[in-house]
Amino acid sequence: MKRSMYAGRVRSEHIGTSITLKGWVGRRRDLGGLIFIDLRDREGIMQLVINPEEVSASVMATAESLRSEFVIEVSGVVTAREQANDNLPTGEVELKVQELSILNTSKTTPFEIKDGIEANDDTRMRYRYLDLRRPEMLENFKLRAKVTHSIRNYLDNLEFIDVETPMLTKSTPEGARDYLVPSRVNQGHFYALPQSPQITKQLLMNAGFDRYYQIVKCFRDEDLRGDRQPEFTQVDLETSFLSDQEIQDIVEGMIAKVMKDTKGLEVSLPFPRMAYDDAMNNYGSDKPDTRFDMLLQDLTEIVKEVDFKVFSEASVVKAIVVKDKADKYSRKNIDKLTEIAKQYGAKGLAWLKYADNTISGPVAKFLTAIEGRLTEALQLENNDLILFVADSLEVANETLGALRTRIAKELELIDYSKFNFLWVVDWPMFEWSEEEGRYMSAHHPFTLPTAETAHELEGDLAKVRAVAYDIVLNGYELGGGSLRINQKDTQERMFKALGFSAESAQEQFGFLLEAMDYGFPPHGGLAIGLDRFVMLLAGKDNIREVIAFPKNNKASDPMTQAPSLVSEQQLEELSLTVESYEN
């Protein structure tokens, strides 16, 4: 029979109606001769009642054979429950079953199909099709669908054109490692799966499309963590003839619409703007979480003349104050923080406690001469804990930034109901790579340098600033964008600054440089990580929770066993040999 409606949508207005439902058996309970079944589908749970006095013997026998996750079809009449269940949207009604049939049986599942299970991640991914049956997972993907629907509506209304760009592209340097795809037709040659549609979307601007967008899969062969996957989805957009401010306005409007459509929240516009240097110096991060205080404070000038070489000879001395929580941190707890500090390159972690109008701790004896100035500068109050890092500016900022976030989580200082958006602007164009021993693009090599600093492309690269902007939400980089280079000579200068020879630049990016000979318009854009955005909206801490079939931390799929070995014949067709491998 045809299904009448979703089980989770039956309400009191349907009382007296004969309906047919289809779904999975959640729980089965036998009480006083009656059998109660929780029927589950994607919209929720509906209670079924099978009364032996009202159904045939065959229906009763079928009901008695039901087990969890059997797929069934039932028909009956909607009636009012004697005692409502306020925990269910369907809690005022139940279905008095008249007909029942089994559409499929099920083995015992490796974990219960319910929220809050304790199965490990690999088990959940091994049986992902079962994991996705759980209500909280279904809700995550309904939310994701609402987000993409809202984004498409917004951008369509602004006359953006949805264009699909190639999945098989050219491998180019800079950025993460590419996933390579060997070509059978062009032996010895490889495609790359795109890390982003960066160059192709810029070429669409040269084609006169003016406003482009795409919700697109991207691929990066990089080390994984909670907010990264080897394949991920981004909301990609590009525009012509707009300023960076105008692009940011468009993105803010899009996010405001998503927040209204999915969470019912009105966000305040425009978003705050914070210079990159301020973010690093005050928060120790280029993606600052502004839901709590505990800002980094520079004490270099105050401590430079103390008789403590760790402080007096350091490039900088910075500190954070953990307000009114000194009693929460024993020596053992502080030692744990010290180990974290060392992971970020710090040589150690100095600390003080402030109580009864005086400082105490291992370094207190060195600071008595400046205790008053220190107390005033840090606005110390009873039971404050002060943590110091004396090192280079970069190490001090990064270390204290990491400790700031760690401590805020430990002490539950974060208001998780807040959605704090902000722009980080005024970025450096380059960042120094110790591993590479050279400057690399902070974003990518197509970012436009500011007019005031472009001359430093042939000088001090540390002084070059970019017309770039990142959008940050609650301590996560939600997306990044910039105005792009559209002048050939500037692009060639950029490649040279990054260490490309003229021949190498031509080999890697000749098609882009050639396009710049044909009236390339001023343009810019942005990409937002869709998975990360949905993760934050759903209140999760891992993007696997909002990706239907994710990979684990080894970039593997426990369900399909991808990646896998391939046959010798397949390798021969590609003229490839595998020298060695480990199972």
Swiss-Prot record:
SUPFAM superfamilies: Class II aaRS and biotin synthetases (SSF55681), GAD domain-like (SSF55261), Nucleic acid-binding proteins (SSF50249). InterPro entries: Aa-tRNA-synt_II, aa-tRNA-synth_II, aa-tRNA-synth_II/BPL/LPL, Asp-tRNA-ligase_1, Asp-tRNA-ligase_1_N, Asp/Asn-tRNA-synth_IIb, AspRS_core, GAD-like_sf. Coiled coil: none annotated. The lineage of its organism: Bacteria, Bacillati, Bacillota, Bacilli, Lactobacillales. It is found in: Cytoplasm. It comes from Streptococcus agalactiae serotype V (strain ATCC BAA-611 / 2603 V/R). Catalyzes the attachment of L-aspartate to tRNA(Asp) in a two-step reaction: L-aspartate is first activated by ATP to form Asp-AMP and then transferred to the acceptor end of tRNA(Asp). The gene is aspS. This is Aspartate--tRNA ligase. Homodimer. CDD domains: AspRS_core, EcAspRS_like_N.
